Structure formats: C-alpha cells, structure tokens
C-alpha cells in the first residue's frame, strides 16, 4: 500500500508539470468497489484531455480514502469521489455504515470537490458506444442480440438500458436464483410499451450463441473465451466493462481474425 501512496505523490508532481506547461486543470478520481482483500488499492491510468489531465485510485475502505485525501488535497484542482455506497463495513465510523464520500468530504478543504457515480457513467458510455456503431442501420439496435455476462449492479443497468432500445438482451450470472429474480425485476421495470424482454440462461454458451454484441461485466474474472467467439456471429463486437473479463486466448483469436 505504501508503494502506491508514493506513486500518487509521484504522479501528482508529474501532472502538475504538464498542467503548467500546457495550461490544463488537474484532477484526481477516488473510486470505490466492494471486491477486495481490504488491504490494497490500485491506481487508474494517467489520462490527458483538451482541458484537464487526471488519474485516480480505486479503493476498498475508508482508511485508504482518508490517507489519499490528505495527500491530494490542494495538490490538484479537482477531486472527484464516487458517491455509490458499495462497501458495507466501516473501519472509521464505529456503528455506522461505510461512507467513502463522507470520509473524503471531511478531509478536503483546498481542492474543488465533486461527486460522480462510476457505474452510471459506464452505462452511459457503453450505451453511446454501441448505439453509435449502429447509427447507419435502419433498425439501430432493434432486434440485435446482446449478451451480458455478469448481471450484477452494472450488468443489470446495462441490460435495462439496451432492452429499452429494442435489443434482444440475454444475461448470465452464476447464481441462478438471483439471475431469475433479476430478469423478472428488469422486465417489470422496463416500459410496458417496450416489446422486447430480457432473457436469461445459466448456460453461458447458450447466452452468447449468435450474439451481435458480447459485454463482459464481471469483476476481475476473465470469462469470455475463444469458444464464445466461435459461437457468436462472425463480426461480433466484444466490450469489456468489468475488470479484465476477456481471456488472453480470446484476445489472440480476435486479433488473428
């Protein structure tokens, strides 16, 4: 952990030099996730845009949020904190629910603080990406088969968004009981006037068979393999919105094709 904290200090100095040279704002993003060993965190890549240069960290508990906040406050123009409450147990507020946003708010006084919801940004970005790929087609996403592997919070939101566009959405999750409940709930939530319905299967190869699009939304579990690409349509579009959902063999095969 100390190594990554030192890297934060190093990258802050690096983006500060770039920002002064190119007259750009600087920003640091603090994201949070429930999947962890509660000890480590990792840094996101440094990204430079027209008006801002930024990087960030994905963290697993409030004590790490506290340490990072003290390091970056006043060193960047903006600090963005993920406001989604994904962590159950607090390791700072005894007897209270975990709250990364609160921890950051209490320890930021110099930089401009803003909040965001990481999963919602991902859903909007993915929706824009996939819909734009079909912009020259008369039906758009209508009737396209889209397979979503990993029907958690993120996968479920994506499924709802795409079925509303008229796509044939199939979802997969290892826990069959939750998979059935999610499918039922999503079909209740979607507009009554939307004719398409979300389907499910606990057979992952059945879900991806003849798919136009395969979306991997598992958290740190490589799930998309070569066999899935062979079972899908020739020009299947594969998107990884999780954390490394595509196996190396599948990437190699896709490059070859």
What are these regions (language model features)?
Residues 1-108:
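N-terminal ligand-binding/catalytic initiation module
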Residues 68, 158-159, 251:
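Generic hydrophobic/aromatic pocket-lining and core-packing "Φ" positions
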Residues 84, 218-220, 242-243:
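Short glycine-/small-residue-rich Rossmann-like dinucleotide-binding loops
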Residues 87-88, 222-224, 246-247:
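Short glycine-rich, flexible loops that bind phosphorylated cofactors or substrates
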Residues 100, 104, 232, 237-257:
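Rossmann-fold NAD(P)-binding glycine/threonine-rich loop
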Residues 113-132:
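A glycine-rich, Thr/Ser-enriched phosphate-binding loop motif common to dinucleotide/cofactor-binding enzymes
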Residues 132-216:
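Glycine-rich phosphate/diphosphate-binding loop of Rossmann-like nucleotide-binding domains
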Residues 209-210, 220-237:
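Rossmann-fold NAD(P) dinucleotide-binding segment
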């Amino acid at each position: 952990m100390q190594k990554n904290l030192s890297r934060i200090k190093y990258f802050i100095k690096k983006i500060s030099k770039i920002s002064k040279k190119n007259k750009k704002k600087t920003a640091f993003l603090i994201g949070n996730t429930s999947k962890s060993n509660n000890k480590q965190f990792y840094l996101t890549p440094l990204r430079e845009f027209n008006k801002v240069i930024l990087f960030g960290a994905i963290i697993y508990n409030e004590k790490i949020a506290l340490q990072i906040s003290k390091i970056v406050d006043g060193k960047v123009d903006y600090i963005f904190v993920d406001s989604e409450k994904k962590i159950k147990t607090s390791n700072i507020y005894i007897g209270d629910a975990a709250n990364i946003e609160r921890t950051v708010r209490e320890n930021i006084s110099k930089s401009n603080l803003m909040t965001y919801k990481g999963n919602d940004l991902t859903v909007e970005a993915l929706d824009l990406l996939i819909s734009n790929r079909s912009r020259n087609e008369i039906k758009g996403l209508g009737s396209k088969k889209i397979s979503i592997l990993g029907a958690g919070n993120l996968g479920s939101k994506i499924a709802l968004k795409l079925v509303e566009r008229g796509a044939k959405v199939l979802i997969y999750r290892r826990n069959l009981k939750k998979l059935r409940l999610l499918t039922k709930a999503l079909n209740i939530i979607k507009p009554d006037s939307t004719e398409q319905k979300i389907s499910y299967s606990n057979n992952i190869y059945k879900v991806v068979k003849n798919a136009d699009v395969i979306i991997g939304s598992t958290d740190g579990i490589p799930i998309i393999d070569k066999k899935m690409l062979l079972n899908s349509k020739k020009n299947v579009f594969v998107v990884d919105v999780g954390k490394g959902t595509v196996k190396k063999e599948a990437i190699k095969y896709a490059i070859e094709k």
